[in-house]
Amino acid sequence: MKLQRHLLLVVLIIFSSAFLFAQKQTITGKVTDSQTGQPLSGVSVRIKSSKNSGTVTNSEGRFTLSAEPRDVLEISYVGFKTESVTLNGETTIAVSLVVASAELNEVVFVGSRGVARAKIETPVPVDIIKVNQIGLPTAKMDLTSVLNYAAPSFNYNKQSGADGADHVDLGTLRGLGPDQTLVLINGKRRHQTAFVALFGTRGRGNSGVDLNAFPEAAVDRIEILRDGASAQYGSDAMAGVINILLKKDINHWTINTGWSGYYDTRNNARKFNGGNQYYSGNAIDGGSYTLSVNNGFAIGKNGGFINISADFLRQAKTYRQADTTNPQLNKNSLAYINTGRRAFGDGSVTTGGIMYNMEIPFSANGKTSFYSFGGYNYKASDAFAYSRNYSAKPERFPTNTDGTLINVPGILRVSNDGETYYNPHIQTHIMDISAALGIKGSMGNDWGWDLSNTIGRNDFHYYGDKTFNASNLGKSAPNHFDDGGFNFLQNTLNLDVSKYFKHVAQGLNLGLGAEYRYERYAIYQGEDASFKSLTNQQIIYPNLVGDGNYDSLRSPAAGSQGFPGFSNTDAVTANRTNVGVYADGALDVTKEWLLDGAVRFENYSDFGSVFTGKLATRYKLLSNFNIRGSISTGFRAPSLAQIHFSNTLTSFSGGALVQSLIAPNTSGIARAAGIPDLKQETSVNGSLGFSWKPVKNFTFTADGYIVKVKNRIVLSGLFSKDDPTLPPSFTSQFPSDVATAQFFANAVTTTNVGLDIVADYTMKWDQNTLKVLLAGNIQHISIDDIHIPSALNDSKLHQKTFYSDREEAFLKASAPKGKWSLGLDYTRGKLGFGAHLTYYGKIVLLGFGDGASPSGDNPNYSGINPQVPTDADPSVYVPEVFNYNAKVTTDIYASVKLSKNLSIFAGADNVFNVHPNLGVNPLAKGWAGDNESGGPWDSVQMGFNGRRLFGKLAFNF
């Protein structure tokens, strides 16, 4: 009897256990990245024995589903190894996914507020760049230069002789303007620089984001979406989006330090500085030193962290000239002295910054988290302006009241042929500060939400150094001026919500949101001496008397030479607000067919409303072959700088220095010219392409695109107040000390057509790894229409003055017709070697031309087919066309991992010392330097500094 009771108890326990294990129970869990400990959103969690039972993790990496106690969960996520977890009756689990090395860098977040997707499965092309991997094996020391080298659709050239453009680094996508690409940090809108480009070969009349205004060490990776995305993100995203993702690492020190310098054995000015004609430096110049530090620390016990980065960069000047001593060695060499730019090259830079990225869950369940990121950066730079030569322009020198020169040692120089000259310095102090903070979480039926505020401010302050206010008669000082500057503030408030509906078709992610943005722009004046004339007296300059010069009686130049300061009439403070709402969705119609769509409405307080939309799709023809395409409308709001910028500055035009007014769009002179209020630029963007992964380690993508932009904002040409054919109602608005004026206007319609190709192959065997990356961009830019203001549209001369052939050439040269890069990287154990080749397509630019040209349709400054006299016969004129033919540069490096904590890199960029062709018509070499930079070359292609050596150390512990 006792035995029977025991057997009955055992049977009851067995049946009870079976009953319990047969009951479904609620399972909760969290999925994190094994490397960073951070939660992963959009991870697929499904019951292995059931095809239809599953879910995805929310924005905090958490999931909930019903399962039987002995079920096996399969947890998968693109870019990570799939994990299987047997429940064994557990109701709470934690899973850490390990990165799948073969698919590292494949996960894409930008372009959709839905779950992440593999790079080759996105409906639009996206480049993913691991900054630390590409930044170490190169001499390039800043983020903008690294992107120019890594992404063929991204283009950037360091400017020289372009006033403020020498001091800020703005890049472009697909040949559009630098302000037609939106920049995000951690998915939040980044503020633009306060600067607007007035000179230079790229981005004339545009603003943009300075990608060097935060530490490169803070960046984990960069996603470049090469497609219009205004419907998803708002203004500026016509060419695409650059999303910068910050590091989240903790307990891991990364310290990188390096040196680089230019070793140009061909065009360093010290090689032929005969007679003190040029400023020059050392055999290796442009020396750069950089130091960066990164580490992170855990906060609390719920997975919180803060990651902190800091960097420092110091770069010296470079000095370049074309060879004037040995024409036999170079058929394009020049037999002349460049008196316009006796100091030509890159300016010097000292910059440093700090940035943080943090996230703190409120509780152990991690459903709600606080996050914040931001930083501070300061840059001091110094660049040479155009040369001042006493024989031609004595009124720009310090003189006594009788016109005799006052010698100022340390500033004035005398060449061996008796010319007295000096080079003013333009200095800038640029401060950039930003902070973002927000709260994100989930609620209800897995609705994710994110409430954030992002603020950023940029201040751009000019100084003139080693220069003069020549109207300060009888005095040689001051020689340093506060020229004033401008600043820009942007504050953005966002609310975003999203939800994944797993039972709609094969899955639908819906995103909704609203944005409120406040912007403020201000110009602040410099000290009086930086812009004012300190005398009403005219001077007879003795060196001009008796030389046949009819105008020896001149007024001394007012203001700081090189960059006249902002005056009290320039000073302005302006602001605006805008409100936007959007909806976007990503629908997996079938397992093969993905459909994306977005709509957005925005209203600006200054110009009104705009509505944009986008439709994108991807179809999986085979498991490894996808076709994709999109069509969208976009817009870019005119920047406050374009609307309100005002300055009187020194411009180099037609071989002469003139005082030019850039009039604000709100001014009476702009209205007299018939220029209306600036409005938004609009675009239509289409793309079609495919992605293919024929084998595990090889991917190939090709994407064609067309972007049509209407009402592009450009900076007009220079109109002279002495032109008798202009309406008096217009010329009467000119200030008395100004010779010419120009304006911002919605004036140009363009079409960009192109093709992007990327082929990526990685092969591993034993201890060897070979990586081959071929990437290219082919494109054509056409100008379809130019809208001339009514008061300036009465003649071909005025039409071409408004937007000249020369300006058209600059716009078309926003990117080369082709740019290709081939990277070969090989590692064996602790050793690494690599070679990177870059092809730059042909660029064609125009000079200013000779105002004395006999051509009836080519008077001075007309901009119509600029021509210059030939060296052989001054009565014969030829077009001043600069053909910068296609070039190929080669970068090489070697690396050694000395220990688990230390690696060393060394090599040379542009190892064969390739330069652009000289900026001159070979038949008119005497006119060399009549280009935008005033030097032997424009700022195009690979730049003019030549070979660059480098060495770097990378510490990890």
Each language-model region and where it sits:
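Short, acidic, small-residue-rich periplasmic hinge/interaction motif at the N-terminus
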Residues: 30-50, 72-80, 88-136, 186
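Transmembrane beta-barrel wall of Gram-negative outer-membrane proteins
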Residues: 251-254, 275-414, 418-420, 427-438, ...
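Gram-negative outer-membrane beta-barrel transporters
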Residues: 512, 704-849
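Extracytoplasmic beta-strand/coil segments of soluble accessory domains associated
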Residues: 64-66, 144-193
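N-terminal periplasmic accessory domains that precede
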Residues: 91-97, 143-146, 150, 169-171, ...
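C-terminal beta-signal and adjacent terminal beta-strands/loops
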Residues: 193, 709, 780, 839-863, ...
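Short acidic/polar hinge/loop motifs at secondary-structure boundaries
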Residues: 64-65, 188-226
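Outer-membrane beta-barrel transmembrane domain signature of Gram-negative proteins
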Residues: 416, 422-437, 442-444, 455, ...
